[in-house]
């Protein structure tokens, strides 16, 4: 069941156009109440609901006045939008919004409806659909589960149309017809009647058409006979053509065999020439290989192979030893890297520790500086100079703590004093506010009471004014009542209702007899039609059997020769399918072999490309390695260059050591010669003869001592360069080995693999060509058989259908046995028409009499209603005159109360003004106290926080200093320096070991290079011997080919080939003549077939058969239509009566529980329907009226009831219609339901609505929407347990409507 959840309104009527003016209302279940004064916008909410659901605008507007007026908004364009969120009949959430645009154009406004959008949840995601208005209307009706007429007239009925149940007859009939959907069913009956007439005309047309179709069918049979004759002549001609073709086939096969042998001889001759060319090339290659070799090995093949294998073992052993050295070198390189890494880490750690030591000293200096600064700020003695001891620092902290406590106490005392003063001011303010609020509540309460009293006073005065002149009206009513009673008595006396009813009863009996007679005639007609259909079907089935026999014969003659040549016999469908399956299997196997070969070929091609790429890559790599070796060494002889470089390094190292020691020796010699006063040489002990000679030696030594550091530096620089170059050359040792491997092993192996792959590719191409030839032979055979399979399948289907036709012929023949057909269809039809004419006459008389009865009853009822209305009006005026004195006293009392309330409100307003002045003064004094308190507190807190921050910084530095000392960072620093020295010693020893291994590896590589040259010589000897063996094989093959050609008798085959070509040409000429005759027969057959394909002859027999079936079935359809018309008409009557009974029961219960008057017991809806039970030309009509019953008297309410009774009756009828027709939609909106109701009926209506809500409370989707201005009515509804909140609709300062949610308990305190 559908229900509405939420709606937003923007720019409609008095609702504002800005986003801030958008109003949103959520609908409660089971009851939503909207309260507000006139003009607040309550009815606009119902109009919006109706528009969003149906697309219809309120009465009296085409849309432009429905949108907020552009002139009021002072805008050129005003956009309005309504959004609704609801659940459809399936419980799924749906959102829809409609938009409108109103534009001000000169002196008029233009209105336009914009595209709407429907949004649904699908698979957890929102799916939006933009639609035109008509599509949205249909979708909304589908989602809500009720028709558009129920939405307009029952659920969302506008206030102006709320009394439609008591409108005039034509309008009331239209609305009830729409609600009951009677119009649609009446149109359906009209359509059935029109279809029946159309079908009757169609039967006549079919009879005329059958005559012409029979002539075309006979002419088509004649053309088919001619085609059969020509096809026989064509078959004979085709037999002659096939005989020529059979004679030609063996000659062609022999010719093909001879041509095959001749091509084989040519192929052998070409092979002999190719072998001679290959022999010459091989002899040339062997000669070139012998010239390239220094000498040829003279021993046996076995000796050569043994020598080659032994040589390979020696080379492999040396290579293994070289690999071991390489591994050892890599191990040492790894160890050196680890030591270098460890050395780097120790250096980093040493730097980090030194940085921490420097930072430790900085922290001590910063701490002492902060202590001096804070002591100066706080005026503490004894802390003018650092560094400070632990005792001084502890004393400093105690003094600072004492100072902080003293400052905090002073600030707290000041804050407490100011807070007390602020509290005093606040108490004074609260007292004045309470007095002001009391006066304000008094004014609000008395203003509300004043409003109610003024409203009651206006109501009382209005009623008094209406009572003027009531006495004269009573006299007029007495006269009218006497006249009405006299007319009623006369009408009852002249009535002939009983006589007419008796006549209607007699006519109905006669009508029943006629109906029975017509049913018997229908049964007889059906039996006659059934036998006629059987004979027609018998003829058509016999013709169908002949056609199928002919089709089977044609298919067999068409494919007999072809299938016999393929299988040896004419197969059935299963045999042909089995043969095709085996042939298809053979084709698939051939295709699989072909695909496998293609795959192998693609793989070989890919392998070839891979080898080519690898070979190119290896050659490029070899070139790169050689360039790299040349760039570093200047030649390809790495070992010699490396040896020379090592000798130079050793020489430079000795020179560096000598220069390093010379400095100390020269210094010692100079000291001995100068300080010790020795006159002899420190080396040779020769005595210097003179002082000048001594000074010359000393000067020479000092000169050498000065030059020694520069020479040492230059030597060390040169030594480092040579060592770097040596390291680079050592790094190229693996590159040199890679060059050797590429030249002697990897590149030759790749070239051998490439030759092998080329041979495999050529073999695969030959195999693929052979399989493709085989596939080209068997596939045409399969295609030919597949073409035949379709016709063979059709033939078997024709054979099955032929058996079915024969069975049906037997069945129809059995049906016609023993049938008496003396009475014709025309005789029965004539009798039926006579009976039908009499039935129509009787029916017309019944209807006429019923109309007379109804007219007399309505006249009498009208007079009774008029009499009752006059009595009721007279009684009402008398009652009102009795209440006049009471109402005058009430008017005086209300006027006195209104004046008293005005005085009291004025006095209270005068007392409020001095209180407001005192409140402003106290509020200003309080704010000044708060400002002083905040300023004083902030200054004290800033001073305390400053001291705390400085103490916190001192503590931070002290903690860092303590952590450094406790962690023992000084000892740890010394430990890391010792470890660094040890790693340097290990690194030096590792370097010496690496130099030794590099030297050994150089020697091994030189030995391996020498062995490789010997290995290449042995390989060339092996290759030469293998080529000599292949040359012997090539010399033998041409001899065998010449021997094979001698056995084929070439000359005799050429002569036979010429004779066969001459015989084949002769047979082909005769074959062409036979084909010409065959073409003539085929042209004649095509001409007849073309004539047979002309519109009048194409499918002439089938058209005749179909037209016969159409005519017979149309007659049967016409009869079914008449039966269906009657059944539908009776179903409409039954549905209408059931629904009216259900609606009247609900109306009766609601009226008795709601209406408090005694003049009307209950009300109900009366509907009168015309009796049409056959497919005649008349339509059924329903005439509706609302009547009120008092005892046995029923009077039309229209024109006889009061305004209050009219409102209550209309409301109850809508409630009943909603409960009956809104099974899928539990929504109902009531707009101002208490209009024109007195207090007693308002209370009973509230009680009835509460009972309805109570009975539907278990229905989760039931929603009642009540809009009213009567707060007493809302209060009555609020006493139930179903209302906690309601909405109040009012105008804001901009005169735009607002919707405010309120509690039901706030009703008594609201001020308008």
Swiss-Prot record:
Cofactor(s) named in the record: Zn(2+)
Name of protein: DNA repair protein RAD50
UniProt cross-references to InterPro entries, sorted A to Z: P-loop_NTPase, Rad50/SbcC_AAA, Rad50_eukaryotes, Zn_hook_RAD50
Subcellular localization: Nucleus; Chromosome, Telomere; Chromosome
Keywords: Acetylation, ATP-binding, Cell cycle, Chromosome, Coiled coil, DNA damage, DNA repair, Hydrolase, Magnesium, Meiosis, Metal-binding, Nucleotide-binding, Nucleus, Phosphoprotein, Telomere, Zinc
A GO cellular component annotation in the UniProt record: BRCA1-C complex
Modified residue annotations for N6-acetyllysine: 959
Subunit details: Component of the MRN complex composed of two heterodimers RAD50 and MRE11 associated with a single NBN. The MRN complexes dimerize on DNA to form joined MRN-MRN oligomers required for DNA double-strand break repair. As part of the MRN complex, interacts with MCM8 and MCM9; the interaction recruits the complex to DNA repair sites. Component of the BASC complex, at least composed of BRCA1, MSH2, MSH6, MLH1, ATM, BLM, RAD50, MRE11 and NBN. Found in a complex with TERF2. Interacts with RINT1. Interacts with BRCA1 via its N-terminal domain. Interacts with DCLRE1C/Artemis. Interacts with MRNIP.
GO molecular function, one term: ATP binding
Coiled coil: 200-532, 635-673, 706-734, 776-942, 1043-1075
Keyword Coiled coil appears in the UniProt entry: yes
Effect of residue 22 to M: In Rad50S; hypomorphic allele that induces growth defects and cancer predisposition. Homozygous individuals die with complete bone marrow depletion as a result of progressive hematopoietic stem cell failure
Modified residues (Phosphothreonine): 690
Summary of the knockout phenotype: Defects cause embryonic stem cell lethality, abnormal embryonic development and sensitivity to ionizing radiation.
GO biological process: chromosome organization; chromosome organization involved in meiotic cell cycle; DNA damage response; DNA double-strand break processing; DNA strand resection involved in replication fork processing; homologous recombination; mitotic G2/M transition checkpoint; R-loop processing
Family per similarity comment: Belongs to the SMC family. RAD50 subfamily.
Reaction equation(s) it catalyzes: ATP + H2O = ADP + phosphate + H(+)
EC number of the protein: 3.6.-.-
Main function: Component of the MRN complex, which plays a central role in double-strand break (DSB) repair, DNA recombination, maintenance of telomere integrity and meiosis. The MRN complex is involved in the repair of DNA double-strand breaks (DSBs) via homologous recombination (HR), an error-free mechanism which primarily occurs during S and G2 phases. The complex (1) mediates the end resection of damaged DNA, which generates proper single-stranded DNA, a key initial steps in HR, and is (2) required for the recruitment of other repair factors and efficient activation of ATM and ATR upon DNA damage.
Cofactor: binding details: Binds 1 zinc ion per homodimer.
Gene3D superfamilies: P-loop containing nucleotide triphosphate hydrolases
Domain notes: The zinc-hook, which separates the large intramolecular coiled coil regions, contains 2 Cys residues that coordinate one molecule of zinc with the help of the 2 Cys residues of the zinc-hook of another RAD50 molecule, thereby forming a V-shaped homodimer. The two heads of the homodimer, which constitute the ATP-binding domain, interact with the MRE11 homodimer.
Residues involved in Zn(2+) binding: 681, 684
Protein residues bound to ATP: 13, 38-39, 41-44, 67, 69, 159
Tissue: In adult, it is expressed at very low level in most tissues, except in heart, lung and aorta. Expressed at high level in testis.
Gene designation per UniProt: Rad50
């Amino acid at each position: 069941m559908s229900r509405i959840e939420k709606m937003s309104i923007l720019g409609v009527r008095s609702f504002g156009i800005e986003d801030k003016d958008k109003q949103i209302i959520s609908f409660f279940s089971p009851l939503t109440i909207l309260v507000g004064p006139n003009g607040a916008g309550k009815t606009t909410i119902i109009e919006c609901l109706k528009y969003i659901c149906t697309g219809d605008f309120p009465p009296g507007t085409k849309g432009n006045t429905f949108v907020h007026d552009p002139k009021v908004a002072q805008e050129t364009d005003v956009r309005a939008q309504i959004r609704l969120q609801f659940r459809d009949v399936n419980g799924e959430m749906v959102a829809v919004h409609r938009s409108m645009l109103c534009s001000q154009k000169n002196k008029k406004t233009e209105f336009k409806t914009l595209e709407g959008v429907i949004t649904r949840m699908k698979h957890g995601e929102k799916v939006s659909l933009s639609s035109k208005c008509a599509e949205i209307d249909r979708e909304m009706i589908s989602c809500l589960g009720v028709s558009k007429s129920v939405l307009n007239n029952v659920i969302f009925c506008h206030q102006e149309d709320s009394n439609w149940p008591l409108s005039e007859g034509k309008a009331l009939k239209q609305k009830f017809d729409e609600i009951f959907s009677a119009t649609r069913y009446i149109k359906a009956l009209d359509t059935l009647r029109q279809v029946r007439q159309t079908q009757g005309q169609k039967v006549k047309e079919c009879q005329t058409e059958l005559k012409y179709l029979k002539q075309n069918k006979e002419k088509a049979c004649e053309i088919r006979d001619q085609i059969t004759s020509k096809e026989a002549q064509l078959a004979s001609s085709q037999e002659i053509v096939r005989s020529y073709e059979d004679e030609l086939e063996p000659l062609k096969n022999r010719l093909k065999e001879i041509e095959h042998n001749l091509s084989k001889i040519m192929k052998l001759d070409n092979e002999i020439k190719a072998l001679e060319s290959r022999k010459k090339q091989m002899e040339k290659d062997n000669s070139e290989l012998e010239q390239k070799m220094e000498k040829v090995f003279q021993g046996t093949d076995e000796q050569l192979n043994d020598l080659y294998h032994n040589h390979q073992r020696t080379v492999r052993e040396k290579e293994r030893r070289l690999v071991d050295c390489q591994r050892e070198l890599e191990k040492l390189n790894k160890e050196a890297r680890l030591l270098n890494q460890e050395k780097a880490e120790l250096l980093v750690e040493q730097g980090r520790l030194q940085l921490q030591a420097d930072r430790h000293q900085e922290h001590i200096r910063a701490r002492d500086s902060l202590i001096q600064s804070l002591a100066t700020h706080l005026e503490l003695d004894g802390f003018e100079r650092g560094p400070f001891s632990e005792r001084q620092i502890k004393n400093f902290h105690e003094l600072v703590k004492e100072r902080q406590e003293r400052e905090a106490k002073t600030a707290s005392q000041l804050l407490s004093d100011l807070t007390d003063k602020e509290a005093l001011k606040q108490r004074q303010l609260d007292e004045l506010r309470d007095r002001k609020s009391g006066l304000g509540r008094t004014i609000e309460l008395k203003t509300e009471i004043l409003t109610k009293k003024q409203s009651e006073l206006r109501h009382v005065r209005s009623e008094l004014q209406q009572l003027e002149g009531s006495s004269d009206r009573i006299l007029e009513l007495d006269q009218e009542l006497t006249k009405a009673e006299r007319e009623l008595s006369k009408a009852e006396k002249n009535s002939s209702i009983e006589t007419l009813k008796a006549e209607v009863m007699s006519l109905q009996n006669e009508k029943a007899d006629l109906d029975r007679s017509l049913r018997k005639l229908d049964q007889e007609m059906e039996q006659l039609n059934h036998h006629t259909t059987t004979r027609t079907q018998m003829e058509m089935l016999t013709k169908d059997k002949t056609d199928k026999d002919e089709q089977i014969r044609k298919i067999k003659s068409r494919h007999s020769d072809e299938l016999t040549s393929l299988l040896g016999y004419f197969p059935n469908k299963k045999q042909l399918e089995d043969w095709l399956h085996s042939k298809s299997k053979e084709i698939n196997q051939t295709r699989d072999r072909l695909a496998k070969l293609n795959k192998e070929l693609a793989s070989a091609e890919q392998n070839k490309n891979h080898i080519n790429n690898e070979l190119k890559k290896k050659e490029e790599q070899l070139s790169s390695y050689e360039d790299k070796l040349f760039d570093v060494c200047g030649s390809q002889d790495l070992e010699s260059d490396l040896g020379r470089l090592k000798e130079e390094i050793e020489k430079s190292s000795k020179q560096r050591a000598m220069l390093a020691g010379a400095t100390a020796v020269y210094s010692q010699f100079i000291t001995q010669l100068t300080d010790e006063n020795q006159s002899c040489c420190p080396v040779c002990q020769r005595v210097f003869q003179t002082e000048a000679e001594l000074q010359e030696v000393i000067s020479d030594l000092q000169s050498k001592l000065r030059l020694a550091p520069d020479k040492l530096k230059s030597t060390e620089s040169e030594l480092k360069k040579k060592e770097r170059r040596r390291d680079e050359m050592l790094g190229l040792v693996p590159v040199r080995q890679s060059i050797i491997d590429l030249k002697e092993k990897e590149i030759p192996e790749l070239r051998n693999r490439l030759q092998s792959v080329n041979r495999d590719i050529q073999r695969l191409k030959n195999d693929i060509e052979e399989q493709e030839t085989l596939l080209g032979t068997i596939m045409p055979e399969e295609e030919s058989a597949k073409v035949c399979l379709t016709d063979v399948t059709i033939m078997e289907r024709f054979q099955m259908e032929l058996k079915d036709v024969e069975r049906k012929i037997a069945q129809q023949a059995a049906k016609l046995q023993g049938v008496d057909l003396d009475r014709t269809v025309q005789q029965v039809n004539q009798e039926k028409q006579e009976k039908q004419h009499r039935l129509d006459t009787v029916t017309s008389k019944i209807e006429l009499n019923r109309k007379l009865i109804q007219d007399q009853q309505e006249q009498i009822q009208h007079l009774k209603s008029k009499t009752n209305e006059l009595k009721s009006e007279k009684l009402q005026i008398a009652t009102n005159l009795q209440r006049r004195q009471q109402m005058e006293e009430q008017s005086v009392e209300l006027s006195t109360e209104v004046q008293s309330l005005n005085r009291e409100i004025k006095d209270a307003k005068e007392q409020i003004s001095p209180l407001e002045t005192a409140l402003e003064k106290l509020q200003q004094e309080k704010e000044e106290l708060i400002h002083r308190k905040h300023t004083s507190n902030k200054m004290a807190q800033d001073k305390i926080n400053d001291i705390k921050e400085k103490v916190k910084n001192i503590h931070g530095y002290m903690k860092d200093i303590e952590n450094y000392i406790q962690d023992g960072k000084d000892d740890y620093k010394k430990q890391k320096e010792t470890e660094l020295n040890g790693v340097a010693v290990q690194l030096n020893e590792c370097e010496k070991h690496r130099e030794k291994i590099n030297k050994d590896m150089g020697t091994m590589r030189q030995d391996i290079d020498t062995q490789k040259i010997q290995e290449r010589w042995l390989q060339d000897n092996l290759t030469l011997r293998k080529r000599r063996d292949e040359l012997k094989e090539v010399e033998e093959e041409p001899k065998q080919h010449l021997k094979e050609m001698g056995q084929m008798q070439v000359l005799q085959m050429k002569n036979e080939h010429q004779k066969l070509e001459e015989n084949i040409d002769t047979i082909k000429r005769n074959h062409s003549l036979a084909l010409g005759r065959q073409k003539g027969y085929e042209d004649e057959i095509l001409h007849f077939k073309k004539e047979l394909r002309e519109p009048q002859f194409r499918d002439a027999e089938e058209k005749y058969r179909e037209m016969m079936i159409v005519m017979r079935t149309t007659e049967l359809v016409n009869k079914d239509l008449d039966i269906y018309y009657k059944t539908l008409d009776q179903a409409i009557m039954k549905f209408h009566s059931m629904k009216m009974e259900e609606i009247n029961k609900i109306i009766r219960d609601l009226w008795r529980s709601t209406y408090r008057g005694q003049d009307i017991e209950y009300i109900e809806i009366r509907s009168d329907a015309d009796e049409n039970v056959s497919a005649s030309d008349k339509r059924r009509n329903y005439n509706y009226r609302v009547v009120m019953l008092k005892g046995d008297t029923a009077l039309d309410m229209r024109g006889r009831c009061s305004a209050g009774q009219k409102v209550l009756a209309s409301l109850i009828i809508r409630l009943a219609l909603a409960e009956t027709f809104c099974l899928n939609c539990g929504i109902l909106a009531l707009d101002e339901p208490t209009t024109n109701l007195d207090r007693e009926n308002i209370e009973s209506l509230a009680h009835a609505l509460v009972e309805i809500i109570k009975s539907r409370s278990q229905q989760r989707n039931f929603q009642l929407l009540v809009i009213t201005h009567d707060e007493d009515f809302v209060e009555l509804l609020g006493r139930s347990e179903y209302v906690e909140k309601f909405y109040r609709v009012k105008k804001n300062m901009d005169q735009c409507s607002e919707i405010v949610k309120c509690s039901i308990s706030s009703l008594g305190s609201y001020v308008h």
